[in-house]
């Protein structure tokens, strides 16, 4: 039995990046041998075990062959006869197909270290094209390592084009696709993820609405990527970044994209609201008090102040591209605070209830906003 550290832990150590999760590969062992040593099986599709003390994942060496469509369309074979080289060749990129033994020696049959040094994301074998999820993974890695100068190898990009043209991307589940999108959006240069998807034709398959933004007389797509990059530079949360990407789409299109990937509820809601109201955000100080109150009501600022704050931030990301200050931020925050400060208690004590109470509260808030605007 030989045990190797594999994948991201080896790659990131060689890059001098922090290593968070460590994956281990076991060659020459059986399921029974692993269990006899106290390892707990957790893999439903292939033998993966948790270490009895550290809780880290240990997988038996395995091979795989294509048996159906999509990410899950594979048959796996794990046995003590599977070699280290046979296991590593099934991996996506050469930089992820390196292993380190117990002595710290590097095992690199597919020249991942060379590609690492040359800053190239290159597929290990032609089997790369059998898994459509790898298109999203490579685009995500391109975004992650863009600050270090990495690029996708031409021949790998060509394979990604073939996958995109095959229709296999449409076999991916919403959950798997969203997981990659979410992780990519939270990288330092998430716009690179979209650029790579567009370069290989995957954006047209997965998000035709966003892809179409690049084909008008004025490229709204380039603007969307600039806003997304700005949001990342300002370390905005996921919901704001998602809203920035979709900002230029119409409400119906945003809803369609949201549902296609089953985005989290907070991401869906913010994207729709930002798409509909960001122009009002930019014109905040020109809005009549009635429109300003209506905007606050739409966002339910009384119960969900954080969502309105994220709306303000998305608007600010859009405006910052012009190098301008954004006084609308403080103006909108002040308006929300003014409306929230209206005390409902005196109205209730006066005996108002139901619709009458609601109408009086709205009138009081409008009066407060009129005074706020007049300052």
Curated annotation (Swiss-Prot):
Binding site for ATP: 8, 11, 91, 137, 140
Listed InterPro entries: CCA_bact (IPR012006), NT_sf (IPR043519), PolA_pol_head_dom (IPR002646), PolyA_RNA-bd (IPR032828), tRNA_CCA-adding_enzyme (IPR050124)
Disulfide bonds: none
Chain ranges passing through the membrane: none
Cofactors: Mg(2+)
Record GO biological process: RNA repair; tRNA 3'-terminal CCA addition
EC number(s) stated in the UniProt entry for this protein: 2.7.7.72
GO MF annotation list: ATP binding; CCA tRNA nucleotidyltransferase activity; magnesium ion binding; tRNA binding
Record keyword Metal-binding present: yes
Residue sites binding CTP per the record: 8, 11, 91, 137, 140
Catalytic activity: a tRNA precursor + 2 CTP + ATP = a tRNA with a 3' CCA end + 3 diphosphate; a tRNA with a 3' CCA end + 2 CTP + ATP = a tRNA with a 3' CCACCA end + 3 diphosphate
Entry keyword set: ATP-binding, Magnesium, Metal-binding, Nucleotide-binding, Nucleotidyltransferase, RNA repair, RNA-binding, Transferase, tRNA processing
Something else known: A single active site specifically recognizes both ATP and CTP and is responsible for their addition.
Protein name: CCA-adding enzyme
Protein's organism: Pseudomonas entomophila (strain L48)
Lineage, opening ranks: Bacteria, Pseudomonadati, Pseudomonadota, Gammaproteobacteria, Pseudomonadales
């Amino acid at each position: 039995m030989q045990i190797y550290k594999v994948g991201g832990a080896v790659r990131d150590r060689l890059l001098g990046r922090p290593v968070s999760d460590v994956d281990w590969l076991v060659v020459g062992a059986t399921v029974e041998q692993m269990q006899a040593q106290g390892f707990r099986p957790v893999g439903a599709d292939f033998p993966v075990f948790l270490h009895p003390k550290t809780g880290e994942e240990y997988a038996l060496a395995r091979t795989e062959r294509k048996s159906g469509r999509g990410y899950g369309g594979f048959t796996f074979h794990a046995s003590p006869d599977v070699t280290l080289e046979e296991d590593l060749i099934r991996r996506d990129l050469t930089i992820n197909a390196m292993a380190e033994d117990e002595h710290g020696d590097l095992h690199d049959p597919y020249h991942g270290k060379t590609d690492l040094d040359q800053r190239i994301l290159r597929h290990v074998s032609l089997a790369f094209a059998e898994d459509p999820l790898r298109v999203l993974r490579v685009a995500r890695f391109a975004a992650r390592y863009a600050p270090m100068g990495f690029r996708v190898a031409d021949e790998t990009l060509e394979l990604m084009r073939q996958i995109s043209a095959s229709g296999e991307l449409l076999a991916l589940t919403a959950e798997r696709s969203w997981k990659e999108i979410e992780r990519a959006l939270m990288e330092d240069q998430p716009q690179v993820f979209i650029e790579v998807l567009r370069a290989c034709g995957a954006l047209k398959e997965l998000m035709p609405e966003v892809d179409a933004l690049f084909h008008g007389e004025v490229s709204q797509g380039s603007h969307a990527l600039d806003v997304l990059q700005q949001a990342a530079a300002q370390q905005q949360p996921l919901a704001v970044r998602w809203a920035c990407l979709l900002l230029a789409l119409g409400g119906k299109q945003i809803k369609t994209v949201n549902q296609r990937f089953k985005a989290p509820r907070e991401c869906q809601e913010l994207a729709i609201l930002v798409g509909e109201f960001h122009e009002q955000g930019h014109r905040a100080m020109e809005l009549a008090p009635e429109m300003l109150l209506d905007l606050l009501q739409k966002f339910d600022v009384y119960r969900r102040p954080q969502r309105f704050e994220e709306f303000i931030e998305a608007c600010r990301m859009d405006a910052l591209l012009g190098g301008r200050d954004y006084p609308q931020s403080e103006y909108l925050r002040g308006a929300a605070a003014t409306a929230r400060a209206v005390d409902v208690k005196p109205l209730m004590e006066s005996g108002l209830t139901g619709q009458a109470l609601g109408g009086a509260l709205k009138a009081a808030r409008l009066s407060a906003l009129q005074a706020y605007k007049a300052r």
